[in-house]
Amino acid sequence: MVDHEGEDSSPADGFGHIPVLLHRADELLGPALTANDPHGGGAVMIDATLGLGGHSEHFLRTYPQLRLVALDRDPHALEIAGGRLAPFADRITFVHTRYDGIEDALTQAGLSPRESVHGILFDLGVSSMQLDESDRGFAYSIDAPLDMRMDPTTGITAAEVLNTYSHGDLARILSTYGEERFAGKIASEVVRQRAKEPFTTSAALVELLYRTIPAATRRTGGHPAKRTFQALRVEVNGELDSLRAAVPAALDALTVGGRVVFMSYQSLEDRVVKQEITPRSKSKSPEGLPVELPGMGPEFRILTRGAERASEQEIEENPRSAPVRLRAAERIARRSAA
């Protein structure tokens, strides 16, 4: 999945997309999936962001005895991926839920939400399918209804946010979720514009942003709509709140030796991931002790040095991988009763 630029199997699969960092994800998750059997026998993997199923198809083909629990909040994605993964249907449990629904998804699959999973993959952001479907409103380059819901069956739309939120709330989400320097100015223009005519399509919003953001910033800061569209999407879908709940649930679900890979596409997501996994990768014993106190050692080992980025070659083959930041961790000890 991606953030206003896209998704990565190299080369592109028959579904017209390339699942991002596929081979690196396999390098990291493979040892956990094959710890007991080279074919993945007895191993359980969660694809927390199924999308079009490119990553899942690779893992199911590579490990012919692997069991998969596949989550997605977008019913259309589940439908498409379900058809794509039909040859492996006897090894998959599909669950229509956000990625913070991991506990319920595991229960639905007949598994414990605690220490029962060997590999978990998060490919965050908006998917290529959602970007490319012109009626979803995710892409600022296409005039479309201002929807932006990843699950179009529930929740508020981006148009409702623009037309009903107060100036203060609009400025807050633009600043917090979009890291937009001109949040207050944009919010003022939105309030002024909607008093004349409510926002319904992306073109009207993009036009306002071109008028509002100074020309000098437009020349050097990328597309003027990028940050505002990101902020609206994060707000509409509750992405950061969902991620803050999902990361601890994913860590709790891993068995000893189990691994998780997170692929983020903007700094806010990556920051949440880092903030959640770092404390559980450190000792809780007082500094200076010559031994580790029982139950006080780190639960996890960080597998990446900082956040890894796509190589120049991958970016050339798949430009939508350019913003990706990958982090991974392995459970090395059971969680203490405390």
Curated annotation (Swiss-Prot):
Keyword Flavoprotein set for record: no
Species assigned in the record: Rhodococcus opacus (strain B4)
GO CC entries: cytoplasm
InterPro entries documented for this protein: RsmH, SAM-dep_MeTrfase_MraW_recog, SAM-dependent_MTases_sf
Leading EC class: transferase
Family: Belongs to the methyltransferase superfamily. RsmH family.
Protein name per its UniProtKB record: Ribosomal RNA small subunit methyltransferase H
Gene Ontology MF, one: rRNA (cytosine-N4-)-methyltransferase activity
Protein encoded by which gene: rsmH
Residue ranges, annotated region (Disordered): 277-298
Catalytic activity as recorded in UniProt: cytidine(1402) in 16S rRNA + S-adenosyl-L-methionine = N(4)-methylcytidine(1402) in 16S rRNA + S-adenosyl-L-homocysteine + H(+)
